[in-house]
């Protein structure tokens, strides 16, 4: 049965030559892990590495498996796009710190819609709507 939910990507780990394992915190299911095959290959695939960067807010479609098993993504779509995150060293460092912090804090977190919404709103405010302190 296909499920669709919004999620914040916490991290992704290289799994093989062409695959990654992605961990995210979802609005409806809590912590989820997926294996994404072919995302690192030279051939064109429906998933790109840019769409699975840490702290990306995405909408994912997947088949729900038993707890503890890695699911396969059917589709992923960006909800919030951080335009300057790659090019702004200050925001990039903040994002890396927050991704690592959230990954450790939310390690066993179950579904909690209000916590998800708070984290999402905080990330959008911090990474999207703040200007450089160096300017």
What label would you give each PLM region?
Residues 129-135:
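Conserved small/polar residues in nucleotide/adenosyl-binding loops
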Residues 83, 125-126:
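Short, solvent-exposed helix-loop connector elements
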Residues 101, 122-125:
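Residues that form generic nucleotide/phosphate-binding pockets
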Residues 119-123, 131:
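Charged mid-protein connector segments
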Residues 1-117:
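A surface-exposed, charged beta-strand/loop segment in the N-terminal or early-internal portion
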Residues 71, 126-128:
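Short flexible/disordered coil segments
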């Amino acid at each position: 049965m296909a499920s669709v939910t919004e999620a914040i990507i916490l991290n992704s780990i290289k799994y093989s030559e062409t695959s990654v394992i992605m961990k995210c915190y979802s609005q409806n299911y809590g912590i989820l892990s997926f294996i994404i095959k072919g995302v690192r290959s030279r051939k064109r695939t429906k998933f790109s590495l840019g769409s699975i960067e840490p702290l990306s807010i995405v909408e994912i479609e997947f088949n729900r498996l038993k707890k503890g098993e890695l699911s396969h993504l059917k589709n992923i779509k960006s909800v919030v796009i951080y335009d300057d995150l790659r090019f702004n060293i200050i925001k990039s460092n903040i994002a890396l710190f927050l991704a690592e912090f959230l990954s450790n804090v939310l390690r066993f977190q179950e579904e909690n819609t209000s916590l998800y919404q708070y984290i999402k709103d905080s990330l959008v405010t911090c990474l999207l709507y703040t200007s450089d302190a160096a300017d």
